Amino acid sequence: MSNNTSDLKSFHYLENGEVSFSILDTVKTEQKLDSGVYTLEYLPYPEMRVKLDVSTDRETIKIYTFPDKDKLDNLFDSFFNKNVIQKVKDLGFYHKVGVLLYGKEGTGKSTILKSYAYKVLENHNGLVFYFTSNQYVNKCWEFIKKIRAIQDNPIVVIFEEMDMYVQKTSEVPEGYLKTILDGNNSIDNCIILGATNYIDTIPNAIKDRPSRFKYVLNIEGIHSEEEILDILTPMISDICEKAEIKEYAYMLKGETLDSIKQFAMDKIMCLQSYSKNKKSMGFSPCK
């Protein structure tokens, strides 16, 4: 069975989580790729094939408010609006959009991306593809183009470390990435989501072109006490008094989502937590 991607005709779901594919018509296999979350990796010589795995990273995603949430909500609502889709089609354009999130580590960029991607999966029968390496991006993208040729599900592509794909160590030149975002390698009915901790490393020709990334949004720490309370309360309300949790929420203002979650986990595990640039936040001993 070949994994040549010239003419995809069948997909085989293996017990180890990998999805094998064939150029042959086969009996009792799927002729289209199931809606789901997948990781892509190209295996060089001697295998020389795309490795497609069903992603096991399907943690429960709860998204919290951030300053530009309404902007993203409206963008996704508009993307799936039937009138908008028809208008774009009438104009002869590909229906595609990109969003790039940036900010320091732990601000919840990946959580936000996953939340929107999984909504497309669940509400629109979408296909979500994660790139796992900056090597052989072109090989994996050619595979995605073959998927697009045989089915019309909305496709969401996630680059979690966008800066990695514009480094000199990347096997694929920056120019190829541009053609994916907005060029002869673009595909229809596609949403590209990227995240980076190092926005200054992203070339202006990529981050400042709305046709490549419609929105480039800074995701900061959480400054709303109420929102921090919403995060902490379901996690530690059974082991902390309401007044304690409110005090913790005040002390955690400006911290990242990751730091807040870790604070709660430390409390659950009876560990001492510290906040950067703030006084140490101690706990009463576990009973």
Regions found by a protein language model. Give the residues of each.
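Structural recognition of the conserved hydrophobic beta-strand(s) that form the central parallel beta-sheet
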Residues: 158-160, 190-197
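Catalytic acidic motif of RecA-like/P-loop NTPases
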Residues: 163-166, 178, 182, 200
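AAA+ P-loop ATPase mechanoenzymes
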Residues: 1-91, 95-106, 112, 116, ...
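Short glycine-rich substrate-engagement loop in P-loop NTPases that contacts/grips substrate
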Residues: 121-152, 171-174
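A short helix-turn-beta junction within AAA+ P-loop NTPase domains corresponding to the substrate/partner-engaging
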Residues: 204-221
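Conserved ATPase-coupling elements of RecA-like P-loop NTPase cores
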Residues: 165-174, 186, 203-206
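Substrate-engagement module of ASCE P-loop NTPases
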Residues: 176-191
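Conserved AAA+ ATPase small/helical "lid" subdomain
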Residues: 218-224, 229, 233-287
